Amino acid sequence: MDIVTEHLKRGRYYAPGKHAGPTCFSKNISKNNAFRAKIKDLNRKIESVFFGCAHNQPLIALVYYKQREQIVRESKLQGKNTRIELSFLLRNLTSEDPNSTYTKEKIYELITDYHDGRQELLFFFWNHLVDTVNFTEILVDRKSGKEVSAISAN
């Protein structure tokens, strides 16, 4: 766990069988683009963890990909281009709707039911990302090309 934490502090992501170097932001890149790059990096971290355990926890992977499909489909119906980041996953992980298939409690059960070394890694992402980061999708108007909603983060 300490190794994983150290990798993440240095801007690296870690998953079983994978290891990437630090993500560097160019000094001349705009603040908005740098922030987007940071979010994409977090997205990769989450995706690598969830994809890495998909053979043992198919429901977690299903949540991720089904929600992605749903948001893309809804956005197209609304005539918008949507850049999908983490919001759909986090929204389901933190859902308080008792009728939702994927409530926070249900996903937490799936994570705590995990019994090898990756359980700690999943806990790390749960505690350090889901509880501290809040994302919204970036919606882009097709005609103007302008963003109609901004990224938000705590």
UniProtKB/Swiss-Prot annotation:
Subcellular location: Mitochondrion
GO cellular component: mitochondrion
Keywords: Mitochondrion
Domain of life: Eukaryota
Protein name listed in UniProt: Uncharacterized mitochondrial protein ymf13
Species, as recorded: Marchantia polymorpha
